[in-house]
Design a protein with these regions (language model features):
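A conserved short coil-to-beta-strand element within the FAD-binding core of flavoproteins
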Residues: 207-220
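A glycine-rich dinucleotide-binding beta-alpha-beta segment and adjacent secondary-structure elements
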Residues: 207-209, 385-465
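An anion/pyrophosphate-binding glycine-rich loop and adjacent beta-alpha core
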Residues: 112-114, 119-120, 134-135, 264-269, ...
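Glycine-rich FAD pyrophosphate-binding loop
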Residues: 83, 99-123
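Active-site- or DNA-interface-adjacent structural scaffold in DNA-acting proteins
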Residues: 35-77
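Beta1/beta-strand and adjacent pyrophosphate-binding region of the FAD-binding site
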Residues: 78-90
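Glycine-rich active-site loop/strand segments that organize a redox cofactor
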Residues: 125-173
């Protein structure tokens, strides 16, 4: 059956009267205007488009799995080269890349708008990548970094930055080489992708559409079923995310699809997620954000330090959160209650001897004050009652009555405030999902399945995740680009 592109021959096929009906119904695609958004409003739109064709004698019948138009004695297939499941970071990058390679593409997106998870990343600012060296990038990927060598080589942080700047999104680099839009608006990143879709006539988005099955024949992809209708294509990309933030559409469908097609999925776990503490005192400091502290994660069973970094963290009603905690959580391979502990150095710029000297000076300046009222220059107000309680020193005790032993205990507490890790917070609160489709079954150069011809994976569905700082979005963009080039 001859294939035509979405817009290539429809002017010849349809007269303007029929074209106007298509456009007015918002069906399938705004074929006629380069300045009109080529996005379908919902999964029923293709059906409405086909009904218009039937009404105008352009299609003999409307079988659920038939998507072609008839001109004279010739039936012309209007199905795409590629179907992409999921309009997130990886899916969008793959779609734009494939379209630029001359492929016709349909994105099936569950939500009313693409990029829903992008809108909330980086606290609504969208940390699009990390402007670091190649070596630094892979140092920040604790899970299966070698698998990403080829994809990152083909599309690195500089490529991502150039992509958005070419779409009129100026970027800036902040502390830790984190790259954000100058506007600090994640919305601008999503708008940039929408703009990229808009001006690529071979790329359309079907929104509010739920894919329920991937079709195969003889170990090769033939299409998908979405909202009860079969759509055919020789290439299908699973880019529907993990299981974190399910309200954005990432509810684990990609893992189910992979398993149904014979792929192994490694155990899923929350990654980059807040931690629940055994200690109740964290609740007393709830809402307190600490800057310039050193957080160290230890494995109490082996005695090994798994992670140590200077930065920011936050106390919550359940335990601890913030950038340092999220990154530390990625170093916990499997949660075991009380096996891991977090050690907070509240004064990393001072060694123990220097800090003790500082305490002696502060105590001398406040010799007649109650202990609890002497720490204002040393600690945030919300943390003082916690430290006093943990030190074992009576808060009403006069400073000039505090013994050397008590002072040393206080000093050691300030250098090693310990939180015992009870558990991860639920996976739907995680920034990313750890685990995923087994990398041994994916071609690292193309992201194509080694089991099913024409099946591809990109983004969070793959068993590869990184620390905070823009690294996970870079993985999504790199793997999405690799898939888009190969589809």
């Amino acid at each position: 059956m001859p294939r035509m592109s979405f817009s290539q021959n429809l002017y010849d096929l349809l007269d303007m009267k029929v074209m106007n009906k298509v456009i007015d119904s918002c069906a399938f695609l705004d074929f006629c205007a380069v300045d009109s958004p080529n996005q379908v409003s919902d999964g029923d739109a293709i059906g409405r488009f086909r009904n218009i064709l039937i009404e105008n004698g352009l299609q003999e019948k409307c079988d659920k799995d038939t998507h072609s138009v008839k001109k004279g004695n010739q039936r012309i297939d209007i199905m795409p080269d590629c179907i992409i499941i999921g309009g997130g970071a990886a899916g969008l990058m793959a779609a734009v890349t494939a379209a630029d390679c001359g492929k016709s593409v349909i994105i099936f997106e569950k939500n009313q708008r693409v990029g829903k998870k992008l809108l909330i990343t980086g606290k609504g600012r969208c940390n699009v990548t990390n402007n670091c060296t190649r070596e630094e990038f892979f140092e920040n990927i604790p899970t299966n970094s070698r698998f990403l060598y080829s994809a990152y080589s083909g599309y690195d942080c500089e490529d991502v930055m150039s992509f958005f700047e070419c779409l009129d999104v100026p970027l800036k680099t902040e502390r830790g080489n984190r790259v954000f839009p100058v506007s600090d608006r994640a919305e601008d990143i999503v708008i940039a992708f929408e703009r990229a879709i808009k001006y690529r006539s071979e790329l359309i988005t079907v929104k509010n559409a739920k894919v329920t099955k991937i079709l195969t024949e003889d170990n090769a992809v033939t299409g998908v079923v979405a909202d009860g209708i079969a759509y055919h294509a020789p290439s299908v990309l699973i880019a529907c995310g993990g299981r974190s933030y399910p309200k954005t559409g990432s509810d684990g469908d990609g893992f189910r699809f992979a398993k149904e097609l014979g792929h192994k999925v490694t155990p899923l776990r929350p990654s980059l997620v807040p931690l629940v503490s055994e200690e109740d005192w964290c609740r007393d400091a709830m809402g307190l954000s600490l800057k310039n502290v050193t957080l160290t994660l230890k494995d109490n069973e082996s005695g090994k330090v798994l992670y140590s970094e200077l930065g920011e963290m936050l106390f919550t009603h359940f335990g601890i959160s913030g950038p340092l905690v999220l990154s530390a959580s990625g170093h916990i391979p499997k949660m075991q209650r009380d096996r891991y502990s977090v050690h907070i150095d509240l004064k990393p710029a001072l060694d123990e001897k220097t800090l003790d000297t500082r305490l002696q000076r502060d105590f001398a300046d406040n010799s007649n004050r109650d202990f609890i009222n002497s720490l204002g220059k040393l600690l945030p107000a919300k943390l003082i009652p916690v430290i006093v309680k943990l030190s074992g020193i009576d808060g009403g005790k006069k400073v000039n009555q505090i013994s050397r032993k008590e002072r040393i205990t206080l000093m050691q507490l300030l250098k090693d405030l310990t939180v015992t890790v009870k558990d991860f917070r639920p996976i739907d609160e995680a920034i990313v999902t750890g685990g995923g489709v087994c990398i041994s079954e994916i071609n690292p150069k193309t992201m194509e399945s080694k089991l099913i011809k024409g099946l591809y994976f990109a983004g969070e569905v793959i068993d590869a995740d990184a620390y905070t700082g823009g690294f996970n979005l870079q993985i999504a963009f790199s793997t999405g680009h690799a898939a888009g080039m190969a589809m």
